[in-house]
Curated annotation (Swiss-Prot):
SUPFAM superfamilies, A to Z: Isocitrate/Isopropylmalate dehydrogenase-like
Pathway the protein takes part in: Lipid metabolism; phospholipid metabolism
InterPro entries assigned to the protein according to its UniProt record, in alphabetical order: FA_synthesis, Phospholipid_synth_PlsX-like
Keywords: Cytoplasm, Lipid biosynthesis, Lipid metabolism, Phospholipid biosynthesis, Phospholipid metabolism, Transferase
EC number: 2.3.1.274
GO cellular component: cytoplasm
HAMAP family, per the entry: PlsX
Recorded name of the encoding gene: plsX
PANTHER family reported for this sequence: FATTY ACID/PHOSPHOLIPID SYNTHESIS PROTEIN PLSX, PHOSPHATE ACYLTRANSFERASE
Organism in which the protein naturally occurs: Neisseria gonorrhoeae (strain ATCC 700825 / FA 1090)
Subunit structure: Homodimer. Probably interacts with PlsY.
UniProt catalytic activity: a fatty acyl-[ACP] + phosphate = an acyl phosphate + holo-[ACP]
Name assigned to this protein: Phosphate acyltransferase
Amino acid sequence: MITLAVESMGGDQGLAVTVPGATAFLQAHPDVRLIMTGDETQLRQALNAAGAPMERIDICHTTQVVGMDESPQSALKNKKYSSMRVAINQVKEGKAQAAVSAGNTGALMATARFVLKTIPGIERPAIAKFLPSDTDHVTLALDLGANVDCTPEQLAQFAVIGSELVHALHPQKGQPRVGLVNVGTEDIKGTDTVKQTYKLLQNSKLNFIGNIESNGILYGEADVVVADGFVGNVMLKTIEGAVKFMSGAIRREFQSNLFNKLAAVAALPALKGLKNKLDPRKFNGAILLGLRGIVIKSHGGTDKTGFRYALEEAYHEAKSAGLSKIEQGVAEQLAALEAAQNETAASL
């Protein structure tokens, strides 16, 4: 039985999204229990209204909620009994294999880092997410917004933890291909930080394939793509916006006249397949990667379907035990990276 901790009060709509999302998830997974943190009276009322299987739900009453615009410092100092903090505590105490929250990203990252700590050798956790491609291939992208200003060493650390996670989840595919997001593929391009990161990765034991432009990510050119949080977040939001724009443009075009409406009927199976593949809700659920525990961040503005998929991501990570397998690999890769760095410095 897998146990997940669910922060029920977080997100733009709170219980209106988390409870129906959790209910649908539980109905699809009889091997899961949930620890739902939040106001017990409100939670119990919402769960009963949703027809949730109460025999597989434990309610952990909390008295505080972290606001969506609350500072990380305030959340850490003043919200020790919040639904967010208590959910993460369940992972720390071994009562749950993973925690899921749609709450304030900065507060969640700060709280998770404070409670769970980072994997030895990793300075900062990163927000990582699996993105679709034009095939069945998926690509892990990080950092998607946690660290807007990074050193070359931190970017190299992101590459290490990303590579180790993908390898742990898909060992049959061999060493993951790691790409560094840049404005061109040539090693002379980019900022000084990116150029220095390129050299670090080039001398590492990772399967580094060089720079990758963002327009190649959805074509599966790499298994892991690395960027600082500023570039990564802009990249992610651009992809999400482009998908939304394209979906709307196709819909409007098919509704523009009678002929196109008739053509839409014939194309309906293909359109449904395309919509299903590009539905951003299916890829909701980002991993706070680099922590000594599994924490999944859902979009704050998601709906019940999107929140269910965030729970699916937590379930997948917990069941595969991928994060628990990577610490040794991370230590070995970081040691090799440091040795290569020292050799490079000595040769200068």
